[in-house]
């Protein structure tokens, strides 16, 4: 008896690699003010078997996953790194917060004492005193030329990723009026913001050379664009997001970025050019995302008009849904996005807690709890605020 077969879409030969970096604030558990103790926490983490990195301010710490290809493998790493880092912080008398900015300003002498960090402080003055914690998602690419093309395809989606993860509405003990105050602060750096559209890797490298020559950056690591090309190994690094409040939100962000890069690579393979979004319109959309987050409006770069911010999330989900289905992640991402839209992201929850209790101390306590929410363990010696 003859049989027929139904043609199916061929399996993707290779899934791009993934890696995630998260930056955190260290605070005094009794006052909520920044704790300048990253060196001690790094040493404590080493004893617990985790490698932590210092950031520009002594009240910051960074974690990084290993490189892998499966989203769900990263979840265990993210949970473990948050829980163990919170434990390392507690053992040195401080508390770990997944927030985009500290809710109180650090002292002016907060620069981490390394040659590189001192050089940055000397060159950029008061800019270096700002404390900003983000989440950086690296997705592997074959080479630099394709990385630049993918960056062009990702530009229109940057504001949506920021609105989704906004997690820094409070600074100096007050609501700033922005869902992501971190993004506004970061915009003061000369190499920050959305990148322009680049014709080629040579065009991209020429822009870096001009910034180096002017002193706007000291090296290529100081290119703070919202998405950039990274080397060794070659990746596209999406940097626009505040550090998400929870592991679940970091997982959602990571999966969306992974799907965006794969979707862009597929478009490049088909010969579909990236949209040449006007740079000033994109900057305006990013500002709007920083201001409103998910609770207000976003700027639609197709219609050039304001729309409810949740509609931007639905547009993003529609754009990457075929890849999410292929990766087996559509249900997880759809459910996570629905939960965020119903219950709020980090910025919304911080404001809700502040409105309910009227004390920044309660916001800090809630943020500390959510930092390792859903993780397997909690810090052994966590101190209540």
Curated annotation (Swiss-Prot):
Its EC number is 6.3.2.2. Pfam families: GCS2. It catalyses: L-cysteine + L-glutamate + ATP = gamma-L-glutamyl-L-cysteine + ADP + phosphate + H(+). ATP-dependent carboxylate-amine ligase which exhibits weak glutamate--cysteine ligase activity. The keyword tRNA processing does not apply. One of its GO terms (molecular function) is ATP binding. One of its GO terms (biological process) is modified amino acid biosynthetic process. Belongs to the glutamate--cysteine ligase type 2 family. YbdK subfamily. InterPro entries: GCL_type2/YbdK_subfam (IPR050141), GCS2 (IPR006336), Gln_synth/guanido_kin_cat_dom (IPR014746), YbdK (IPR011793). It comes from the Bacteria. This is Putative glutamate--cysteine ligase 2-4. Keywords: ATP-binding, Ligase, Nucleotide-binding, Plasmid. It is an enzyme of class 6 (ligase).
């Amino acid at each position: 008896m003859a049989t027929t077969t139904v043609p199916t879409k061929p399996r993707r030969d290779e899934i791009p690699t993934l890696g995630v970096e998260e930056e955190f604030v260290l605070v005094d558990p009794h006052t909520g003010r920044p704790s300048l103790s990253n060196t001690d926490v790094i040493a404590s983490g080493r004893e617990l078997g985790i490698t932590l990195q210092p950031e520009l301010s002594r009240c910051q710490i960074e974690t990084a996953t290993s490189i892998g290809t499966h989203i769900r493998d990263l979840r265990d790493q993210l949970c473990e790194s948050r829980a163990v880092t919170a434990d390392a912080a507690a053992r040195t008398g401080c508390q770990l917060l997944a927030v985009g900015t500290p809710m109180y300003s650090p002292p002016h002498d907060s620069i981490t004492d390394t040659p590189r960090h001192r050089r940055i402080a000397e060159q950029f003055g008061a800019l270096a005193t700002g404390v900003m914690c983000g989440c950086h998602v690296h997705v592997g690419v074959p080479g630099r030329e394709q990385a630049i093309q993918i960056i062009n395809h990702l530009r229109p989606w940057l504001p949506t990723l920021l609105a989704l993860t906004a997690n820094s509405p409070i600074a100096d003990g007050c609501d700033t009026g922005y869902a992501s105050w971190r993004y506004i602060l970061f915009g003061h750096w000369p190499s920050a913001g959305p990148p322009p559209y680049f014709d080629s890797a040579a065009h991209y490298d020429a822009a870096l050379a001009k910034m180096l020559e002017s002193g706007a950056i000291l090296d290529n690591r100081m290119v703070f664009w919202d998405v950039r090309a990274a080397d060794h190994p070659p990746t596209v690094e999406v940097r626009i997001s505040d550090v998400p409040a929870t592991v679940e939100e970091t997982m959602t962000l990571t999966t969306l970025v992974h799907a965006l890069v794969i979707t862009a690579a597929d478009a490049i393979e088909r010969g579909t050019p990236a949209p040449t979004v006007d740079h000033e319109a994109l900057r305006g959309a990013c500002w709007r995302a920083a201001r409103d987050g998910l609770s207000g409006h976003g700027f639609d770069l197709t219609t050039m008009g304001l729309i409810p911010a949740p509609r931007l999330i639905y547009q993003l989900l529609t754009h990457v849904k075929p890849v999410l289905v292929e990766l087996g992640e559509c249900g997880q991402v759809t459910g996570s996005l629905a939960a965020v839209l119903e219950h709020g992201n980090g910025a919304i929850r911080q404001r809700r807690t502040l409105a309910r209790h009227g004390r920044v101390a309660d916001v800090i306590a809630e943020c500390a709890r959510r930092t390792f929410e859903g993780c397997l363990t909690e810090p052994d010696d966590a101190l209540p605020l």
